[in-house]
C-alpha cells in the first residue's frame, strides 16, 4: 500500500544510470536513488549534485569474488592474477575516484585521501573502515523476494 501511495510522487522508475543522469542534468529530476557511479559522473560533468544522509543510514551492500568448483584448472594462474590486480591499491583508487565505489583494500582509501583530501567524505566514506561500515544499513536476503518483486512490478505498471 505504501508504494502505491508514493506512486504519484514519482516521475518514473529508472532503468539505467543514463536515464537518471540525463534527467538530473536537465533538471527533470531534483532527487533520485542511484548508484554511486551516477553521482561521480555528474560531479565530473561539473554539476552541483549532493548525497543525502538519511538519519537511519544509507542502504549499502558488499560483494566479492569466488572461485567456482568447476573452474578450469589450466586457468587458475590467470584467475589469481585477475584477483590480485583487482585487490590492488591502484584498482581501489580507480573504483573510488571514477565510480565512487568502495573497495576491499583499505589502503586505497588512504591513498585517495592523501591524493585528493576531502574526496572520501564527499563520496560518503571515511578512511576508518569501521566508521564507513557502521554508517550503513546492509541489505539482507529476503525470504519473500519473488512476491515483493511481483508487487513492485505491479506498482511500476500503475496498478
Where are these regions (language model features)?
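Non-transmembrane alpha-helical segments in soluble domains
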Residues: 3-4, 21, 25, 33, ...
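Ligand-binding pocket segment of bilobal, Venus flytrap-like solute-binding proteins
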Residues: 1-54
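A bilobed periplasmic-binding-protein/Venus flytrap-type ligand-binding module shared by bacterial periplasmic
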Residues: 62-75, 94-98
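Sec/Tat-exported extracytoplasmic proteins
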Residues: 6-10, 14, 28, 43-46, ...
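Soluble non-cytosolic domains of exported or imported proteins
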Residues: 14-18, 73, 77, 89, ...
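Short, surface-exposed loop/turn microsegments at beta-strand edges and helix-strand junctions
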Residues: 55-60
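C-terminal capping/gating helix-and-loop segments adjacent to ligand/active sites or protein-protein/ligand interfaces
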Residues: 93-159
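A short alpha-helix capping/helix-coil boundary motif
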Residues: 17-20, 61, 127-129
Amino acid at each position: 500500500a505504501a508504494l502505491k501511495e508514493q506512486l504519484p510522487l514519482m516521475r518514473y522508475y529508472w532503468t539505467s544510470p543514463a536515464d537518471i543522469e540525463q534527467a538530473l542534468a536537465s533538471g527533470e529530476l531534483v532527487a533520485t536513488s542511484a548508484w554511486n557511479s551516477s553521482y561521480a559522473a555528474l560531479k565530473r560533468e561539473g554539476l552541483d549534485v549532493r548525497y543525502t544522509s538519511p538519519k537511519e543510514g544509507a542502504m549499502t551492500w558488499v560483494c566479492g569474488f569466488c572461485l567456482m568448483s568447476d573452474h578450469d584448472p589450466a586457468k587458475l594462474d590467470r584467475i589469481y592474477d585477475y584477483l590480485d590486480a583487482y585487490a590492488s591499491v591502484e584498482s581501489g583508487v580507480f573504483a573510488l575516484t571514477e565510480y565512487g565505489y568502495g573497495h576491499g583494500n583499505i589502503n586505497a582509501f588512504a591513498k585517495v585521501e592523501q591524493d585528493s583530501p576531502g574526496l572520501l567524505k564527499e563520496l560518503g566514506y571515511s578512511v576508518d573502515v569501521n566508521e564507513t561500515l557502521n554508517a550503513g544499513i546492509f541489505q539482507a536476503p529476503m525470504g519473500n523476494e519473488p512476491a515483493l518483486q511481483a508487487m513492485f512490478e505491479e506498482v511500476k505498471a500503475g496498478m
